[in-house]
Amino acid sequence: MKENKNSPEYPRTKLLPGVLFIVLLIILDQITKIVAVHFLGGGQNVILIPGVLEFTLIHNSGAAFGILQNAMLFFFIITAAALVMIFFILSRTPSARRYLPMRLCLYFIAAGAVGNLIDRAVFSYVRDFIYFSLIDFPVFNVADIYITCAAFTMVLLTMFYYREENDFSFLSFK
């Protein structure tokens, strides 16, 4: 029989270190946006790798690819729901080293969500500034990188690392 990850041998994750890490990530995101506004605010682009990567500032009042323009209430509700879910999962996650990758992914997703939420609350748009011109990808920011990379990593972890039947038993209400 496998050990129960809800048992006392698996103490819960302490939230304070994670919250401090999230705050640090949010600060980093906001600093990059401030720097982008300072250097790109006049409409100029900075080409880092010609035909591949450049910095260009846009004000995005929607989501990726320009969808959901000016849907502020929707973004606030979705972000709040995501943060509640993330902190619920974190509060129940065992502190075992095995769950560190999952915790880190959740920290990055939370930081990205809050970073963009701050922009929406303060400016009514998100400050995006990283542009991959090679594939004409939508302009994005550091918070978007946090969310995308962490979500992709979570999918991989779920597929290849957390494969045992009881790996997520700590989320059960039993």
Describe every region a protein language model picked out.
Residues 1-174:
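Alpha-helical transmembrane bundles and membrane-interface segments of multipass inner-membrane proteins
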